[in-house]
Structures are given as structure tokens and as C-alpha cells.
A protein has these predicted regions:
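Conserved nucleotide-sugar donor-binding subdomain of glycosyltransferases
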Residues: 35-46, 50
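Glycine-/small-residue-rich "gating" segment that lines the acyl/pantetheine channel
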Residues: 91-109, 116, 130-165
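Conserved beta-strand elements of the Class I
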Residues: 62-65, 122-124
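Condensing-enzyme catalytic core mediating Claisen C-C bond formation in acyl metabolism
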Residues: 1-36, 122, 137-176
Length: 176
């Protein structure tokens, strides 16, 4: 499981642990501070890998669409992507926030609409979630299942209307 919460990593800091090694609920401020520190670097790493895998030069990116529901920071990962990946400062940016687990679908739908409207558009879509920030100690089955399914991470895709040189996936429809 990936986590940015050091207290959950072997040998990590104990700022989120109570006596008896029980996780205490972090305050909203503590969770958001961790989100602000870790979300952008994860997004940049995923975005850079997606561009490299697609063989797309950062200068070709016309739009950035990001999605996240586990925290908020402004300026956010969208601006970090532009700055740290060397995208044009005028790159259009959009953040899809607080739409839950399925936010990648509206983000991809937005990228698809951009590319249908402008066949020369190249859209970098990056989703970043830091789910372990919201980990709570509980013996409720729903909480146990949720915490066993979700971890911290980021995923990215490059969406374009132009012909690709290698294997691609087609965005054929969205039902969210």
C-alpha cells in the first residue's frame, strides 16, 4: 500500500499515533497540509511518465486537466504540472475537484471534448488521490473495506485527436 503518512510507514514519524500505536484522527488542517506537500510531486511524476510513454514533447501540450477529491491546495497540481514539466505558461488548465472516486471519468470526458473541438489539442490528464490522509481507526466493516481498497497515488493519460504512432485507447463514451 502506498501512503504519504509517515506514521503509517515502518520506522516513520509518530505525529499521528496515540499511546498504544492507535491512529488518532488527523485534523482537517493536518490532512490538507500533507495533501499540499505531496499531491503535486505525485502528479508531476505521473504526468512526466505519461508524456514520455506517449512520446509527446511537453511543448506540444495545450491543456492540462487534473482531478482529485482527497484534498485541496491553490495553486494546485495543475500549475505544478505546467511549471515543473516545462509546459507553455499559457497552457489552459482545469481542475475537477471533489467528484469522488470516479473523477477521472469527467476529466477524461473533458479532455475528449477539448480534442473533438480542436483536433490539434493535446491534453494531459492527471488524477491524484491521497486516500490514506483520511484513514480512521474503526472496526466498522465499511471503513475496513474502504481502507483496504484505496491507497495514495496518481495516474495520467495523454489525450489527442491526432494519429498516434503506437498503440492507443479510444475514448468511446462516458456514463457517469
Amino acid at each position: 500500500r502506498a501512503t504519504v503518512v509517515e506514521a503509517l510507514v515502518d520506522g516513520g514519524a509518530s505525529e499521528l499515533l496515540e499511546e498504544g500505536d492507535r491512529i488518532r484522527p488527523a485534523s482537517t488542517g493536518e490532512r490538507n497540509d500533507l495533501y499540499a506537500r505531496h499531491a503535486s510531486p505525485l502528479a508531476v511524476e505521473a504526468g512526466g511518465r505519461a508524456l514520455a510513454a506517449a512520446g509527446v514533447d511537453p511543448a506540444e501540450v495545450t491543456h492540462v486537466v487534473t482531478a482529485s477529491c482527497t484534498g485541496f491546495v491553490s495553486p494546485g497540481p495543475d500549475l505544478a504540472l505546467v511549471r515543473e514539466l516545462g509546459l507553455d505558461p499559457g497552457t489552459a488548465r482545469l481542475h475537477v475537484g471533489f467528484m469522488g472516486c470516479s473523477a477521472a471519468f469527467p476529466a477524461l470526458r473533458t479532455a475528449d471534448a477539448i480534442c473533438r473541438a480542436d483536433p490539434d489539442a493535446v491534453v494531459l490528464v492527471v488524477c491524484v488521490e491521497l486516500c490514506t490522509l483520511h484513514l480512521t481507526a474503526s472496526d466498522e466493516p465499511e471503513q475496513i473495506v474502504a481502507m483496504s481498497l484505496f491507497a495514495d497515488g496518481a495516474a495520467a493519460a495523454v489525450v489527442a485527436a491526432r494519429p498516434a504512432s503506437g498503440p492507443v485507447l479510444a475514448l468511446d463514451g462516458f456514463l457517469t
